[in-house]
């Protein structure tokens, strides 16, 4: 049993057994871990994936914004420095500096970008220069608009004034016509009353005065300012006709009164007119002062008949007239 091969066998056997047990334990532990990982691992990993998926677009966007802002700021700084130093290149010189080959796509793209940047700067400068000019042009545009508004207000005021005057003038014309119409009959009545009450010597000056007053009224009413000439002519014509109508009955009445006074003073005076017609004319003149007796047309047959009748009646008239005169005394 103390032989060396047996000792190695005994040691190797123990090592082999313990090593095999250890290896089996490791395998079991690994299997269990993998089994637990299959159960618990997917939920955690999915949650982490979802979180990464949710966070990545926002992070990318913010990062892109930040980078774009930084790049824009850098370009602005470069352009400011170039402006301050006067290093802004012209459009043709940029392409010459990059590449002599005109068909190079990269150089052409770069020149386009540079032109865009230079164009933006030029626009900014032009806008800053145009702002005061625009404000000045706005002020200039406002000044003529104000003048036009003032002119329009003046025109509207003049139009309203003309309309008001035109609305007033017809009323004044109507009132003048009514006053003249009311004045003409009243004047005629006053003239007739004066003829009835006063003798012949006082009638002539009063009639002339009344006619002068009527003429004064007509002239004052027709010569008003603002009345057209056609209306003034019409008024003058109507007033002349009214005055003629007033003058005609006064002449007839004076002739009748003269004959009546001559009979009263001297009853022996012969007159071809009948006294009844005189009395009738007295009572009729007060009621119808404006009427004028129409002129009788004379025919030879009627004149002969009337002459024969008048020759028969003179004696009767002479007898009747003294009696009436005595009664009046």
UniProtKB/Swiss-Prot annotation:
Q: According to the UniProt entry, which residue ranges have a biased composition of type Basic and acidic residues? A: 293-320
**Entry keywords, A to Z:** Coiled coil, Membrane, Phosphoprotein, Transmembrane, Transmembrane helix
Coiled-coil residue spans: 58-85
What are the Polar residues biased-composition ranges? 154-184, 201-223
Bias kind Basic residues: ranges: 232-242
User: Which one Pfam family would you cite for this protein?
Assistant: DUF4599
**Could you give one GO CC term from the UniProt record?**
membrane
Region Disordered, as annotated, extends over: 149-184, 201-250, 288-329
Question: Transmembrane stretches, by residue range?
Answer: 11-31
Name which cysteines form disulfide bonds. none
Record localization: Membrane
Q: Which residues carry this modification: Phosphoserine?
A: 152-153
Main location, first listed in the record: membrane
Provide the topology term for how it sits in the membrane: Single-pass membrane protein
Query: Which family, according to UniProt?
Result: Belongs to the SPATA31 family.
What's the protein called, per UniProt? Protein SPATA31F3
Q: Which organism is it from?
A: Rattus norvegicus
Task: Tell me the lineage of the source organism.
Answer: Eukaryota, Metazoa, Chordata, Craniata, Vertebrata
């Amino acid at each position: 049993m103390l032989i060396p091969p047996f000792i190695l066998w005994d040691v190797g056997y123990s090592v082999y057994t313990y090593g095999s047990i250890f290896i089996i334990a490791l395998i079991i532990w690994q299997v269990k871990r993998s089994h637990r990982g299959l159960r618990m691992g997917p939920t955690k990993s999915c949650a982490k994936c979802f979180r990464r998926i949710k966070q990545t677009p926002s992070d990318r966007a913010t990062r892109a914004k930040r980078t774009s802002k930084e790049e824009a700021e850098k370009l602005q700084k470069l352009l400011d420095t170039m402006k301050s130093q006067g290093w802004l290149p012209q459009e043709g010189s940029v392409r010459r500096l990059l590449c002599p080959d005109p068909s190079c796509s990269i150089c052409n793209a770069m020149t386009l970008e540079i032109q865009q940047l230079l164009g933006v700067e030029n626009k900014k400068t032009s806008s800053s220069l145009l702002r005061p000019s625009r404000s000045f042009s706005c002020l200039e545009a406002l000044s003529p608009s104000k003048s036009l508004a003032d002119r329009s207000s003046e025109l509207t005021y003049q139009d309203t004034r003309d309309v008001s005057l035109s609305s007033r003038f017809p009323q004044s014309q109507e009132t003048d016509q009514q006053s003249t119409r009311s004045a003409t009959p009243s004047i005629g009545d006053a003239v007739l009353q004066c003829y009835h009450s006063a003798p012949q010597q006082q009638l002539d000056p009063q009639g002339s005065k009344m006619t002068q007053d009527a003429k004064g009224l007509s002239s004052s009413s027709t010569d008003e300012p603002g009345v057209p000439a056609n209306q003034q002519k019409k008024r003058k014509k109507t007033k002349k006709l009214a005055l003629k109508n007033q003058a005609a009955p006064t002449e007839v009445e004076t002739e009748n009164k003269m004959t009546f006074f001559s009979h009263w003073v001297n009853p022996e005076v012969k007159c071809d007119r009948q006294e009844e017609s005189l009395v009738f004319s007295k009572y009729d003149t007060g009621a119808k002062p404006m009427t004028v007796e129409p002129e009788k047309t004379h025919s030879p047959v009627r004149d002969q008949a009337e002459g024969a009748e008048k020759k028969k009646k003179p004696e009767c008239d002479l007898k009747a007239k003294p009696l009436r005169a005595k009664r009046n005394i």
